[in-house]
Structure formats: C-alpha cells, structure tokens
C-alpha cells in the first residue's frame, strides 16, 4: 500500500501538513508505528511517552497543538487523569483528545467518552482513521466559535453521497483510500444542474418539488439542495484563540463553487445537509404538484395508473350504461388527463383526488356496483356484469332508494302502514308497470326503520310457531349474479306475498304466487344456537367426569398398594417363619378384593346420578 501516493491524492483538497498532532504512547514500538503512519499522512507530529510530558508540551506549545492522540494505558489511571485535566481546562478544551488502545471494551469506551474524549480508536490503527483526524479539530473549533485553519487548498462543489454507499460512514469521510465513486456515474443528469440551483440557501430558499421533475428521457433530475456552513476562507489570518464572528447567513458559500470528485459523507459534522422531503418509492420520484394545481406523474407510474383505472372502468361500465359514453376519469366539469411531450401525465387536482378511489375500484373488482344513478334510471334485466362477484347474504343499503321505496317511506310518515315490496318478475311480460311508466326493478331487500320487525332469519325453521315455512324467493337476476335470499316477516301465513302500493290515495293489493320449488329440504336445517350450546355443555361434562374417574381409579390403586404393605411408623414389616405379620389388623387380601369391588360399583352408581346430571335433567 502506497500511503504517500494516497495522501498526495488528497493534498489537492486538504492540506494536512497544517495540522499538528501531539502523540503519547508509553510503548516504543507502538509509538514508532503510529508516528510513521501520521508522518506519511503529512501531519506534523510531536511524540512523547508519558502523561507528564503531555502536560509539559501543552504548557510550552499549547497554541500550536491541534489534536492529542494518546494511549489510554499509561497506565490507565494516569491516562484517565490526563484526559480529565485537558477537557476541564478552559484554555485546553479547544484541543480534541483522541484515545487509543488495544482494549476493545465497551465500559472503557463509555468512560472515555463521558470524560470528554472526541473519539476512541482501537489498535492497530487504520489509515482511514488517521486521515480523518483533522475533522475532529474542525468540529471542535466550529463548536467553540474559534478561528479555523485554512486547510482547504481549493474551493470545491458538494457531491451528496448516498447513505447506502459503503464509503459513507464515520471512519472514511474525506479519506483518500476509499472507493471514491461519484454519483455522477449513476445520475448523469446531475451535471446539467444550473449554477443557481447549487447556490440555493438553506435558510432562505425552500426545497421546491419541481426540482425532481423528469428529463427528456424520463430519468429523475432532482438535485440535493446541499449547502456548506463554511466561513470565508480569505479572512482566517490571526491567532487561533481569536473568536470568530459568525456570518449572519452561514448557509452560503463565500465564492463560486467548482465541480470536483470529493465525496462528503452525511454523517460528518463538516457540512449541513438538507434532507429531501420528497419520498421515493421503487426508484421513482413521486407525483409532483405545481403551482396551478396540476399533478405530474412519471411515465412508468402513469402507465400503471392507466392499467388500474382501465380495470375499474371495464368492470363497472356495464353498470353505468345510462351514460352515453364511458369517459376515463371524467369528473364534474373537468377534462381527462393530458399527456405532454416529455411523457408526463397531468391530472387536475379533482381528478388526482379521485385517483385512489378509481384504483381501489379496479383492484377490488367492483365489490359493490352502482345499482342506480338516480331515481329515474334503472338497470334492465339484460344487463350483465363482467365479473360476477358473489355477494354476501347481507347486502349493504343503497344510497338511493327506488321510486317505489321512496313513496313507501313518505306514506309511512303520513301514517299509512306499508310493507316493503319485493318484485317477483319471472319474465319480462309479467313485469309490473306503475303509473309513471317505468318498469318495476328487481328490488333488493331494503329494511326501513320503524315499518315492522324486519329480522333476517337464518332458516324457515326459526319460526315454528306460525305453522308454516317461509320459502326463499328466487327472483330473476342479471346474468352472472347469484341469487339473494329474500326473507319476509311471518305475518302472512299464505304462500303469497302481498305487494302493496299506494295509488291515488288508496291501497291496492297485487298478489304474486310463489313457487315452493326454492324451499330448502328439512334435513338441511341447521341446529340452532341453543342446541349447539347444550350439546357442547354435555360433551364437556362427559369429559370432566371421565377425567375425575381416572383420578379416582389412580387413587384407589395407590390405596390398595399401601394397604397391602402395612407398616408401623418408623418400622418395617416383620416376617415370622416366612409369613407377613399384619400389624394393622386388616383382613386378608381376598376378602379385601371383594369389598373393593363392591365399593367401586357403589362409586360408579353415585357418579351416574351426580347432582350435576340431575340439575341438567330438570
């Protein structure tokens, strides 16, 4: 590795020879290695071997020393004491102290940082870390408001580095041995940015969304509005301790920037970055809104938008035949999207707001088609839906009621009792025509509040007290749509449904005979909720009794074994002439077995007639 060549590569921008480092290490070998590395990086190095020599050097050459790089184990107690002394001294706290050690232990690192260390390096030291030591000096002077050393040889322009770039981290900022890949290679449009965009101020100029527009080839040309907090470099002569008067507008360059390949990492405190507030999805810029309320979409996003919108239109245009022409995304008094020369699609603000509504319609495949466009237009029986989605048994209530239902609502408010009608049209010839000349539509089950008790029943067997079964109506539906179960309140015991309408102030009854062909078989009637609960309760009790029975059996077996081996507390059973001596006076085992069987039978009988079962039977 040619360190000299690498360091010379960075001398075009940063002059490290103006930085003086005080190196302290009690190990001669380590001291020589670090001294060589710092010298090859063009730093001015002063080497000492003890904490006392560090204090003496600071007292003698304090104003000329910029950075202190010290070993923590001098021993450690002295190293910590030296660190505490330097960070608490008012004249020396401008000097950043960087501790180094072979111990990579978290408690030691935390203790050093709490005492005021600027950084903690683990040996062996790497070139990147040494090349970046000057940034600690720059931060400290900047934080304290002191004058800065003129280390930058040339003015340069900022090239914002990607956060995901492996070179953008806290250890290789401004280093020369990294893979210095500029973002120009990945974004060729960045070089075409105007000089005015590069000089925008953070404090005065907002980040405009138009900077992220499309170029001629459809690629993104958004510029990262990055400005540096850099004071004028021509007025830095003077003492290091002289306070610097801050610029009233620090977010501007003192001179015209020049293009370069210097990578500035975002994690560094050397520059202030303006983070882009525009979110990016899938490598594309989001839609942009200009001043006149138009929405600009990229070519790829616009194509996806057209596909999704076309799906929604194709799935619902059959339900909208009342309109002569199906226009794509035509809103009230607004024009459709326009396509300009560069491939961007412009949407008005109203159309942009309805973009998500139309897209969700296409994705859901028209879960609920518009059943009516008003009180004067209805769908005919011959209309079909492209995707016949199976609707659930419970339909949502339509926003616009048919004319007949509205009249029923009005009549109910006037005091007349009306039953919701269900049009049973078996064919087009049997369609009922009202006074207005419109054909009666296939009405869906509407449930009007306050008319009567309109309860959706699961089956006809739910109401046995009426002595009949209410059939499921099977009216004619549009092709591709499944039938809905129609339920009627069980107040009419005949197999005829009374359709009531109010004409000329009088109530007339129009009877429609229902065919019992749609009745479900009685063996398919589901068990009601009460029966299911009772069955589950019985099953649970049986299992509980079985578990208790097993426990009792285990207890009886243990008792039998214990009684067959009688013993006195603290003594063993004595044997006389090979015969067991029963000290407890228990009967023989044969007699005991008979009595045990009788006890088990009694327990089983008691279990069969338990209080829980008696309560259940009653």
UniProtKB/Swiss-Prot annotation:
It comes from the Eukaryota. GO terms for cellular component: nucleus. InterPro entries: ARR-like, CCT_domain, CheY-like_superfamily, Sig_transdc_resp-reg_receiver. Residues 588-610 form a coiled coil. It is found in: Nucleus. Expressed in leaves, flowers and siliques. Restricted to the vasculature. SMART domains: REC (SM00448). The keyword Nucleus applies. Residues 161-174, 187-200, 246-257, 324-334, 375-389 have a biased composition (Polar residues). One of its GO terms (molecular function) is DNA-binding transcription factor activity. Residues 533-575 form the CCT domain. The keyword Disulfide bond does not apply. Induction: Expressed with a circadian rhythm showing a broad peak in the late day and early night. Negatively regulated by LHY and CCA1. Belongs to the ARR-like family. PANTHER family: TWO-COMPONENT RESPONSE REGULATOR, TWO-COMPONENT RESPONSE REGULATOR-LIKE APRR1. Controls photoperiodic flowering response. Component of the circadian clock. Expression of several members of the ARR-like family is controlled by circadian rhythm. The particular coordinated sequential expression of APRR9, APRR7, APRR5, APRR3 and APPR1 result to circadian waves that may be at the basis of the endogenous circadian clock. Positive regulator of CCA1 and LHY expression. Interacts with PIF1, PIL2, PIF3, PIF4, PIL5, PIL6, ABI3 (via C-terminus), ADO1/ZTL, ADO2, APRR3 and TCP21/CHE. Both the phosphorylated and the dephosphorylated forms interact with ADO1/ZLT. This is Two-component response regulator-like APRR1.
């Amino acid at each position: 590795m040619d360190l000299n060549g690498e360091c010379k590569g960075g001398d075009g921008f940063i002059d490290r020879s103006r930085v003086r480092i005080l190196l302290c290490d009690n190990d001669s070998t380590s001291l020589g290695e670090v001294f060589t590395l710092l010298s090859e990086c063009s730093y001015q190095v002063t080497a000492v071997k003890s904490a006392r020599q560090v204090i003496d050097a600071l007292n003698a050459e304090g104003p000329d020393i910029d950075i202190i790089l010290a070993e923590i184990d001098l021993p450690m107690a002295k190293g910590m004491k030296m660190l505490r002394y330097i960070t608490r001294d008012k004249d020396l706290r401008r000097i950043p102290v960087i501790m180094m050690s072979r111990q990579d232990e978290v408690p030691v690192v935390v203790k050093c940082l709490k005492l005021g260390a600027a950084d903690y390096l683990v040996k062996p030291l790497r070139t990147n870390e040494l090349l970046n030591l000057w940034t600690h000096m720059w931060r400290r002077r900047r934080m304290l408001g002191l004058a800065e050393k003129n280390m930058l040889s040339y003015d340069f322009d900022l090239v914002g580095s990607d956060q995901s770039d492996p070179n953008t981290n806290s250890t290789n900022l401004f280093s020369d041995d990294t893979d210095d890949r500029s973002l120009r290679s990945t974004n060729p449009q960045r070089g075409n940015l105007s000089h005015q965009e590069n000089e925008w101020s953070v404090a005065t100029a907002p980040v405009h969304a138009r900077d992220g527009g499309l170029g001629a080839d459809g690629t993104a040309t958004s510029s990262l509005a990055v400005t540096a907090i850099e004071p004028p470099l021509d007025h830095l002569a003077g003492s290091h301790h002289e306070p610097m008067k801050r610029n009233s507008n620090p977010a501007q360059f003192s001179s015209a920037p020049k293009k370069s390949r210097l990578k500035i990492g975002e994690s560094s405190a050397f520059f202030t970055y303006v983070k882009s507030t525009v979110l990016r999805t899938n490598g594309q810029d989001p839609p942009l809104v200009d001043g006149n309320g138009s929405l600009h979409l990229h070519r790829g996003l616009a194509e996806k938008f057209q596909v999704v919108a076309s799906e929604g239109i194709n799935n619902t245009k059959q339900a909208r035949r009342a309109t002569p022409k199906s226009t794509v995304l035509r809103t009230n008094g607004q024009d459709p999207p326009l396509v300009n020369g560069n491939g961007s699609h412009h949407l008005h603000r109203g159309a942009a707001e309805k973009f998500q509504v139309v897209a969700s319609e296409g994705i859901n495949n028209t879960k609920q088609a518009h059943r009516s466009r008003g009180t004067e237009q209805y769908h005919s029986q011959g209309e079909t839906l492209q995707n016949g989605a199976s609707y659930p048994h419970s339909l949502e209530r339509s926003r616009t009621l048919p004319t007949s239902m509205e009249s029923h609502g009005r009549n109910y408010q006037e005091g007349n009792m009306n039953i919701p009608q269900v049009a049973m049209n078996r064919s087009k010839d049997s369609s009922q025509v009202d006074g207005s000349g419109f054909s009666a539509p296939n009405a869906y089950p509407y449930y009007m509040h306050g008319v009567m008790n309109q309860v959706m029943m699961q089956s006809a067997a739910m109401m046995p007290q009426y002595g009949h079964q209410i059939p499921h109506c099977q009216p004619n539906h549009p092709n591709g749509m499944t039938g809905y179960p129609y339920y009627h309140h069980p107040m009419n015991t005949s197999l005829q449904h009374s359709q009531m309408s109010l004409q000329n102030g009088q109530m007339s009854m129009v009877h429609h005979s229902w065919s019992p062909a749609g009745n479900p078989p009685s063996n398919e009637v589901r068990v009601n909720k009460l029966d299911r609960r009772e069955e589950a309760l019985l099953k649970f009790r049986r299992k509980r009794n079985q578990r208790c029975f097993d426990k009792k059996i285990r207890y009886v077996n243990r008792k039998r074994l214990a009684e067959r081996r009688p013993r006195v507390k603290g003594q063993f059973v004595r044997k006389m002439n090979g015969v067991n001596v029963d000290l407890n006076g228990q009967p023989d085992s044969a007699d005991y077995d008979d009595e045990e069987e009788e006890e088990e039978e009694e327990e089983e009988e008691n279990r069969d007639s338990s209080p829980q079962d008696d309560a259940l039977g009653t």
